[in-house]
Amino acid sequence: VLTPRQHGQFKRDVRKSEKRGKDMRKLRTLLALLIEEKPLPESYRDHPLKGSWAGFRDAHIEPDWLLIYRVSDDELQLARTGTHSDLFDE
């Protein structure tokens, strides 16, 4: 079991997703799988990131709603969540 750690920006991103009317149960389902270290279904399209996000992974909650995270030792680091443009057009 991993211990989740939310970055400050992740908390702000969650609030933004809630305001957009996203179904937060989908995010909680993904987080539960990650915390329990269970394999993710293919539908999440989980993959490693490159460039400035090297060392992190990206999982798709919906086609244009992503979670960026990293597993380090016994910790699940939750970095960002949002759309492709929220996360990569900065």
What are these regions (language model features)?
Residues 1, 15-25, 29, 60-66, ...:
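Enriched for short, Lys/Arg-rich terminal
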Residues 4, 47, 76:
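A broad, low-specificity signal marking well-ordered, structured residues that form hydrophobic/aromatic
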Residues 6-10:
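Basic, amphipathic "hinge/linker" alpha-helix immediately C-terminal to the N-terminal HTH DNA-binding motif
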Residues 11, 50, 88:
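Nucleotide phosphate-binding site architecture
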